């Protein structure tokens, strides 16, 4: 039997993800792709960047760039919203980037909306506030001092601007959609910020890749880059300053997983992508 996109992006699941996965749509990547293609052509905000031990972690930026480049090819105008730890990551691919200050307020975000008038918003591995209004890592340690409040956009414009969240641990923007399930199973205070569609993956990058594979099938066009390109991009971010979110080391690994595992996931998604294009 052919593996689904969701089965691929949930390989090697840990941290209670198989449990909370029950509360997410079986075909969440397809639904995300369908939602994106329903948006009017224009600006799409993409946000990522998760602070870990003085750096941004390697999970998030790669998936965001892959998704942003796919959106460009489909006629959208991706704009990256992030903060200082991701400085220089997105300029590598000439993507328009806004660095949101740590003390940003509602006026900051109102001006962003008025300036760009986004047709949709996507978050990939971006920490969101918990019920105590804190941004916390998987160990429950506050990283609020190092996290711009970009999730305010998803709160203030819920129901106004369509949104998609991609996460893998429970503390990311979008997880508010299943916060109750996370609270019951995982030993952390979940993010309470919801999105219209939630994609849960073992690694958030994989969730973003899964959305791109689903987009490919719907438009009949290969949008997913080859593994060597993805590895090269992650390597460049590590050289700039990015760490593995599990080991906290400046290595070309993601959430403790090697590039061999990354290649395995990309290869599996490429098979599905090719099948969708040929269908």
Where does each model-flagged region fall?
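A glycine-rich helix N-cap at a beta->alpha junction
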Residues: 94-119
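Conserved mixed alpha/beta catalytic, RNA-binding, or beta-rich assembly cores of soluble enzyme
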Residues: 60-61, 120-221
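Short internal beta-strands
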Residues: 76-83
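Short, glycine-rich nucleotide/cofactor-binding loops
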Residues: 20-24, 50-62
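Structural motif
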Residues: 43, 119-120
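Histidine-anchored nucleotide/phosphate-binding helix
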Residues: 57-75
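Positively charged, low-complexity intrinsically disordered leader regions
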Residues: 1-43
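C-terminal functional extensions of proteins
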Residues: 173-279
